[in-house]
């Protein structure tokens, strides 16, 4: 028998473990430590390296796969990506479905679902788990066991039971385990009215009052928050959701978009909530960002044609087609954004001990649809830093941020636009600097000024003061007659401003003037102890007025 080939050993390497030990023990002593300056440099380099290792907000979706790509894990992954979160997935079922409905369902074995959960949760830092289609009692219990073994920061439960097309996606027997086991672990549960009805034994939900009662009843099952979604209440003029935290009911209103491309809205909303929670948002803020995102996505997708069925998907990545990504596109301004226009005031915020960032955050949480930073007393650097911070908040919320007068600040922080007065740079000059993808507003008091704003390429005009105001010196009051004259003459959307508060905002909108899209408010929001409460109250007044 031939001898075994001798193993080749490089002459500079040890040929055995004992030799290796000898080399280690006989190696020269460590070099002396670096001098203090070098040590300081090394610490700085290490700190810089650590700073570059940014944590990525991570959402794990536990849901079914939609072969048509409109709902399920496909919608979840797209929604999380659109809001800047990483999304991993555990597939609970594989469905054959398209725009016409669901043709077949294959449920993944429970043990393999458990294996998927273990793979992700044991290795990756998951911030939030979001659930979708959980087809059986066993699947729900596997999830509960895994979450007890691997706790996460938050659990968002979308109790998917029936598809948009009406097909059953979960056994009726899962209702009890949802109520008795899963909901108690949830930070928020997001049923639509049909799902809420099933969870409560088939009760009828036809009004907002019914939705409130349902939210309160579901809350008793143990979740920290409940969001009952009213998008399926087609007889309603708007899409109203009811949010309940165990103490307070909050109605969240959105415009109803006329489109058939609504497949996956529930999955998307829950995934957006999960993404914002993973980024550290409060629950109410996360819900508002999610609702704004879905409304905007539906608006941008309303005319898309995908498939031949009645329930089409919508474009989660619509922002890639909007400024600043597409420089040649037209402005993305929508007149309805003027509905509740919050204008900040540094003096008022200082009076109440708020930063500009805190004021903007509070206004958005209360329901402001657009925000203008008007900071007359701030130094440029201070103003810019505040504007950048506010821009992050507004961008994540889908609420436009405009800068008053300061085009340089708007450019530096990439704000959504600028508002200028009659003594400032013209709208035409501002457009030359900002480009076609930004919003430009102009203060106007006369039909001639409104016409000039139109000629200069403005997007809207602010008209006032409608009432006497202390925020602007030597500002003449136009009254209802002056407002009416400008609105009738204007070819642009109009927002009323000047002395508007909770006692008179309704009367302004009740005028029913053409092109009047909303009110701009300063003191009534920011010269108060609670910006959130005042903004919410103002939003309610305006919403109720617009319904009449």
Curated annotation (Swiss-Prot):
Region (Disordered): 1-40
Catalytic activity: 2-[(2R,5Z)-2-carboxy-4-methylthiazol-5(2H)-ylidene]ethyl phosphate + 4-amino-2-methyl-5-(diphosphooxymethyl)pyrimidine + 2 H(+) = thiamine phosphate + CO2 + diphosphate; 2-(2-carboxy-4-methylthiazol-5-yl)ethyl phosphate + 4-amino-2-methyl-5-(diphosphooxymethyl)pyrimidine + 2 H(+) = thiamine phosphate + CO2 + diphosphate; 4-methyl-5-(2-phosphooxyethyl)-thiazole + 4-amino-2-methyl-5-(diphosphooxymethyl)pyrimidine + H(+) = thiamine phosphate + diphosphate; 4-amino-5-hydroxymethyl-2-methylpyrimidine + ATP = 4-amino-2-methyl-5-(phosphooxymethyl)pyrimidine + ADP + H(+)
Residues annotated for Mg(2+) binding in this entry: 405, 424
Broad class of enzyme this protein falls into: transferase
Protein name, per record: Probable thiamine biosynthetic bifunctional enzyme, chloroplastic
Record's compositionally biased regions (Low complexity): 11-28
Cofactor dependency: Mg(2+)
Domain of life: Eukaryota
Biased composition (Polar residues): 1-10
Native source organism of the sequence: Oryza sativa subsp. japonica
GO cellular component: chloroplast
Organelle transit peptide residues: 1-47
Cellular location(s): Plastid, Chloroplast
């Amino acid at each position: 028998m031939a001898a075994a080939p001798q193993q080749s050993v490089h002459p500079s390497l040890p040929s055995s473990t004992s030799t290796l030990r000898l080399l280690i023990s006989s190696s020269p002593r460590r070099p002396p430590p670096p001098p203090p300056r070098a040590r300081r440099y090394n610490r700085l380099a290490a700190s810089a390296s650590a700073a570059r290792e940014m944590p990525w907000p991570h959402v794990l979706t536990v849901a079914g796969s939609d072969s048509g790509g409109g709902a399920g894990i496909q919608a979840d992954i797209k929604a999380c990506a659109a809001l800047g979160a990483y999304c991993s997935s555990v597939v609970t079922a594989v469905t054959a479905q398209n725009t016409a409905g669901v043709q077949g369902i294959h449920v993944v074995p429970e043990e393999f679902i458990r294996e998927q959960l273990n793979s992700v949760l044991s290795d990756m830092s998951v911030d939030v788990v979001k659930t979708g289609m959980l087809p059986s009692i066993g699947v729900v219990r596997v999830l509960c066991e895994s979450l007890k073994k691997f706790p996460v920061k938050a659990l968002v439960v979308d109790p998917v039971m029936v598809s948009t097309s009406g097909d059953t996606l979960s056994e009726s027997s899962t209702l009890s385990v949802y109520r008795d086991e899963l909901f108690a672990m949830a930070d928020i549960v997001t049923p639509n009215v049909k799902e809420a009805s099933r969870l409560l034994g088939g009760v009828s939900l036809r009004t907002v009052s019914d939705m409130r009662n349902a939210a309160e009843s579901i809350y008793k099952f143990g979740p920290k928050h409940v969001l009952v979604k009213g998008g399926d209440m087609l007889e309603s003029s708007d899409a109203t959701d009811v949010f309940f935290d165990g103490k307070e009911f909050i109605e969240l209103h959105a415009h109803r978009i006329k489109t058939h491309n609504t497949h996956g809205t529930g999955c998307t909303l829950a995934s957006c909530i999960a993404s914002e929670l993973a980024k550290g948002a409060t629950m109410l803020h996360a819900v508002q960002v999610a609702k704004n995102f879905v409304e905007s996505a539906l608006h941008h997708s309303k005319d898309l044609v995908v498939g031949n069925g009645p329930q089409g998907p919508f474009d989660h990545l619509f922002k890639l087609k909007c400024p600043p990504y597409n420089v040649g596109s037209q402005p993305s301004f929508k007149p309805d954004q003027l509905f509740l226009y919050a204008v900040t005031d540094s003096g008022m915020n200082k009076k109440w001990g708020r930063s500009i960032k805190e004021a903007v955050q509070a206004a958005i949480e209360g329901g402001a649809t657009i925000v203008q930073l008007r900071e007359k007393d701030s130094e440029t650097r201070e103003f810019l830093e505040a504007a950048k911070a506010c821009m992050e908040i507004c961008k994540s919320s889908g609420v436009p941020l405009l800068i008053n007068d300061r085009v340089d600040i708007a450019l530096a922080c990439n704000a959504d636009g600028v508002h200028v007065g009659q003594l400032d740079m013209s709208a035409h000059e501002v457009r030359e600097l900002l480009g076609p993808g930004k919003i430009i507003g102009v203060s106007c008091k006369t039909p001639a000024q409104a016409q000039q704003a139109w000629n200069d390429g403005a997007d809207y005009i602010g008209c006032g003061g409608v009432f006497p105001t202390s925020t602007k010196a030597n500002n003449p009051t136009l009254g209802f007659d002056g407002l009416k004259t400008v609105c009738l003459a204007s070819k642009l959307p109009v927002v009323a401003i000047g002395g508007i508060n909770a006692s008179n905002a309704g009367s302004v909108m009740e005028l029913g003037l053409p092109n009047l899209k909303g009110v701009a408010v300063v003191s009534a929001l920011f010269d108060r102890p609670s910006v959130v409460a005042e903004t919410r109250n103002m939003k309610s007044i305006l919403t109720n007025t617009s319904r009449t």
